[in-house]
């Protein structure tokens, strides 16, 4: 998939809805239709800059206080007590689901072409959130073919689902075999400086009955606890609310991904 492919082209391409419903959901959640049809691309969504309520303001607004890290200063107003690191949030809607699905990206420069896992595109450094060198650009996204018994789902919490940036988002991938979970990934978006992979998800879910709500609840709580260490006051919504909602969004994504994996009819749910 070329990085310059328009979001609307992805939504209108039937195989995406049938084979990668989680990706369809994420792309559908990006911006208003005017953005999807005229200016929005999948590469642009993956490479967008991090956001923060203190940085994304006019020069007049920012002139009223000390310059923050992202603007070239030496403090972060989003972090309680200040910080020498920028704690802006990665707001890409497509990144969590694509990382959960083990997507790779092709990076090109004048002299070199390289392929790497999508998660390696993100530096988790708020001032410079991408690992791209100045002479490099993202040219392709490679999405694996969905294997039998696998399902993926995307969830987003926002005031207005498509128009607003996410308060919290989640991409989940689950592969089942013989009624049990074989593989699983969960990636939380909009809470940290880069997409946040929950390391314990596969260990917790592997070999458990597919759809085991106790196991899914354990992962959801672990996701919330993990996010709590990274989440900052970089949005207008309270940190406490966003932190608690991580578990809710994670549970929804994992539950629907598992249902799709078991039913193999996930494309019917992507509307």
Where on the chain are the PLM-derived regions?
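C-terminal structural segment of proteins
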Residues: 1-271
């Amino acid at each position: 998939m070329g990085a310059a492919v328009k979001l609307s082209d992805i939504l209108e391409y039937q195989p995406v809805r049938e084979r990668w419903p989680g990706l369809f959901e994420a792309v559908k959640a990006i911006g208003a239709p005017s953005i999807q049809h005229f200016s929005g691309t999948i590469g642009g969504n993956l490479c967008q800059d991090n956001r923060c309520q203190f940085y994304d303001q006019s020069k007049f607004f920012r002139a009223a206080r000390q310059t923050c890290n992202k603007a070239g200063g030496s403090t972060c107003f989003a972090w309680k007590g200040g910080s020498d690191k920028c704690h802006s949030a990665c707001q890409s809607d497509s990144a969590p689901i694509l990382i959960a699905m083990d997507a790779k990206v092709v990076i090109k420069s004048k002299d070199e072409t390289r392929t790497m896992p999508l998660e390696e595109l993100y530096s988790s450094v708020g001032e410079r959130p991408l690992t791209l060198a100045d002479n490099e650009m993202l040219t392709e996204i490679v999405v694996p073919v969905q294997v039998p018994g696998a399902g993926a789902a995307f969830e987003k919490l926002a005031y207005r689902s498509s128009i607003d940036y996410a308060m919290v988002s989640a991409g989940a991938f689950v592969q089942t075999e013989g009624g049990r979970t074989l593989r699983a990934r969960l990636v939380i978006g909009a809470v940290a400086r880069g997409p946040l992979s929950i390391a314990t998800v596969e260990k917790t879910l592997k070999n458990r009955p597919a759809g085991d709500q106790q196991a899914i609840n354990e992962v959801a709580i672990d996701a919330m606890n993990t996010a709590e260490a990274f989440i900052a006051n970089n949005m207008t919504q309270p940190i406490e609310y966003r932190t608690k909602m991580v578990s809710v969004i994670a549970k929804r994504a994992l539950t629907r991904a598992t249902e799709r994996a078991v039913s193999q009819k996930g494309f019917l749910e992507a509307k």
